[in-house]
Amino acid sequence: MKILVTGGAGFIGSNFLHYETSAYPNDKFVCLDALTYAGNYNNIKSLEEKENFEFVKGDITDREFVDKLFEKENFDLVINFAAESHVDNSIKNPGVFIQTNIAGTQVLMDAARKYGNIRYHQVSTDEVYGDLPLDRPDLKFTEETPIHTSSPYSSSKAGADLLVMAYYRTFGLPVTISRCSNNYGPYQFPEKLIPVVISRALNDETIPVYGKGENIRDWIHVHDHNIGVDMIVRHGKVGEVYNLGGHSERTNLELVKIILKQLNKPEDLIRFVTDRPGHDLRYAIDSSKVERELGWNRTYTFEEGIKETIDWYVNNQDWINDIKSGEYKESYQRSLKK
């Protein structure tokens, strides 16, 4: 099987490719990534040595480029990880999110229709459901929870999800959607909460926490998320949505304190800052559908996963420093000269 993985140089996509290229040596994986600021060629550089991996630099919004790639490669499956994903950036510049997350999805699905009605999977987020009250721990998002977005980011992902299901119903494109809770693990771009806290704490810098730190997130290790995506694309029912959650709810303040404790750093590094506009209160995912129908279950407890993640960042500070310095942006160009 030949599989197109878009956004494969990003955090979740690169972890997916590291797993898949080893787990399925007889499948061919083509990674398409525009290498925008959060796409890091260093995340997948080691995969270039594998016979079942190929990297292609390109933008999913470039219709002519995407069509030529589909015509050349004859894909059997498309998995779309490509997305602008940082909520704060979406508040500052929503247009970029609309273009990549919605228009890019349309370009990919049009190509999938044109070149053989190719199986298509959309990687989405629990943020399309909006948020839950802090005082109702019994409530969780199910696949039937109505879409009720809060930010330009989540709205762009919801728009893409609606478009995916419209292509299924109107054109018969064989699609699935996965919606995950907050991912954590290696290779996460250091603009997101966990790598920000680790990086700043290692340098004894203050740790900004929105509001009072009471907002709750459900955390899933990126490997567990990607195992779920793998099960869905290979065994899931076409036309269905599947939630993937980590069963690991923590307040943002609890999470920061856990990281500081493991790093032996003082809690007085914490600084409470003005809350994010429209900040979602609580996310919690009900994963019972994918557990029941496909046999998926998480393999990491939060305690195991966060310790391993912290250790990875401690042992890979050069990776973070390359990003901070901008050096990572040159890695792909250097690879072309070899």
Feature-to-residue mapping (PLM):
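The catalytic Tyr-centered alpha-helix of NAD(P)H-dependent dehydrogenases
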Residues: P137, T149-S156, P186, P190-I194, ...
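Short, conserved catalytic or interaction motifs in soluble domains
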Residues: N89, P186, G246
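N-terminal Rossmann-like NAD(P)+-binding domain of SDR-like oxidoreductases, especially those catalyzing
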Residues: M1-N183, Y313-N316, S325-K338
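Residue-level recognition of oxygen-bearing side chains
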Residues: F65, V96, A103, F189-L193, ...
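C-terminal substrate-binding subdomain of Rossmann-fold SDR/epimerase-dehydratase oxidoreductases
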Residues: F16, S22, F29, G39, ...
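Residues at alpha-helix caps and immediate loop-helix transition turns in enzyme cores, especially N-
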Residues: N40-N43, N93, G104, F189-L193, ...
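Conserved active-site helix of classical SDR/Rossmann-fold NAD(P)-dependent CH-OH oxidoreductases
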Residues: T105-Q106, A158-M165, P195-I198, N226-I227, ...
